[in-house]
């Protein structure tokens, strides 16, 4: 990369900041949510000096205030393939495959995000990106009409496409071009109050699935939520309710724990927004419900062994009493079942359930001859090294689907005959998705190697 080029990490930060400003204007409640999260995070850090020191030690304190994830939905393989190229300019790459059809949502998805520890520390912005699966629309005529509508739309500006080409050709962008790229790329994610279909078509799409209407009826894949990261989601949810926000009844993901794992999410219901639906006589006024506010708390990244235990316990909690996650006692069921999941970092580490980042302490740096021959666990026990949880940077398929469903209007759960199709998704993407377990394994291995360096 030429010395005159701006780092992809810097472009990503500029883009994340610009998107946050835009979304704050479009959805003012998002601004309230960000302020609420910042206040709770400050309280948690003031009350928990050990956590504050851990974040500082792992270059995670600075990223906390800027940390966001967004979510979008696209309609065609061409849109998805171009998005992959757009995100690559910002150092964001597809990680993981998520099949949401199992939860009655006709999409499959990936998360575009940075991969290396250094890039994540600079700015961990991630975008959960879903591709509509038209083949899951049962009505053949509606499926064909949807494909025709989507084929006509252009979700990228000419300027954005030209700058993507330029970045790929030259190996990067200089400052002025990077700023122009952010400006042009942002247009893809902007909300438009004018639909591209008439009201009867919108209703037909809506009857097929609310999300089909959201993808097909508009000019582009408006950002449907932007999520700040909190250090205490239970306190944040209580504060949301105090502020009069229609918060979800259940926090998605694992229960509250001493050692948070994976991801917990909650949100307020989607906003009903005024939309103009065009027709030959000037059009109709209507409404659309899609965009909502969400917060998340991120915990320890689990190994395949840890993830298998998590999935098993989650399934147990959902199946108990046959009420899934909708019963009023779900929180208690979850807490009871997860008593079987170790809740101290020594056990989690020693049983190989989670990934950890190892670093020498001052005592370890002062005694290189002792460090050279001792296993990592012995170094930790002797106070010569620390082992801090590696943050889970990805998503939960069940959680993602639950958030989609609850915010699109509640209880609808439908089973689709076709389910996962990773091969078709990767073909549309133009590359294979990165394996999240391999990424965490590499981060842990790099930290272990650095102990001996």
Would you name each region that the model predicts?
Residues 1-453:
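Extended, well-ordered protein cores
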């Amino acid at each position: 990369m030429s010395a005159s080029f701006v780092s992809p990490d810097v472009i990503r930060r500029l883009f994340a900041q610009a998107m946050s400003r835009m979304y704050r204007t479009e959805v003012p409640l998002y601004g309230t949510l960000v302020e609420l999260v910042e206040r709770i995070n400050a309280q948690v850090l003031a009350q928990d000096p050990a956590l504050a020191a851990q974040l500082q030690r792992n270059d995670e304190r600075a990223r906390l205030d800027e940390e966001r994830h967004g979510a979008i939905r696209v309609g065609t393989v061409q849109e998805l393939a171009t998005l992959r190229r757009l995100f690559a300019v910002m150092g964001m790459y597809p990680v993981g495959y998520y099949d949401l059809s199992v939860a009655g949502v006709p999409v499959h998805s990936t998360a575009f995000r940075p991969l290396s520890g250094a890039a994540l520390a600079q700015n961990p912005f991630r975008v959960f990106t879903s591709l509509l699966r038209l083949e899951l629309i049962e009505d053949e005529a509606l499926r064909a009409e949807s494909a025709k509508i989507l084929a006509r739309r252009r979700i990228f500006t000419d300027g954005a496409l030209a700058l993507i080409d330029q970045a790929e050709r030259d190996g990067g962008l200089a400052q002025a071009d990077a700023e122009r790229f952010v400006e042009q790329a942002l247009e893809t994610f902007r909300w438009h109050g004018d639909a591209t279909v008439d009201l009867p078509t919108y209703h037909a799409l809506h009857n097929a699935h609310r999300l089909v209407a959201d993808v097909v009826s508009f000019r582009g894949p408006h950002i449907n939520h932007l999520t700040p990261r909190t250090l205490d989601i239970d306190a944040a949810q209580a504060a949301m309710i105090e502020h009069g926000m229609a918060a979800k009844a259940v926090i998605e993901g694992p229960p509250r724990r001493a050692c948070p794992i994976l991801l917990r999410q909650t949100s307020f219901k989607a906003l009903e927004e005024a939309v103009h639906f065009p027709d030959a006589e000037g059009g109709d006024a209507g409404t659309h419900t899609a965009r909502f506010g969400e917060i998340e708390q991120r915990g320890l990244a689990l190994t395949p062994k840890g993830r298998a235990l998590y999935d098993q316990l989650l399934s147990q909690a959902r199946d108990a009493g046959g009420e899934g996650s909708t019963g009023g006692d779900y929180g208690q069921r979850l807490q009871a079942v997860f008593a079987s999941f170790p809740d101290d970092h020594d056990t989690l580490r020693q049983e190989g359930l989670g990934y950890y980042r190892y670093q020498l302490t001052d005592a370890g740096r002062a005694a290189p001859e002792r460090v050279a021959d001792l296993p990592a666990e012995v170094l930790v026990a002797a106070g010569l090294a620390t082992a801090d949880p590696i943050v889970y940077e990805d998503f939960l398929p069940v959680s993602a689907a639950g958030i989609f469903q609850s915010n699109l209007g509640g209880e609808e759960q439908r089973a689709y005959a076709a389910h996962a199709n990773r091969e078709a998704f990767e073909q549309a993407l133009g590359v294979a998705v990165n394996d999240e377990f391999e990424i965490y394994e590499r981060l842990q291995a790099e930290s272990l190697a650095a102990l001996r360096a």
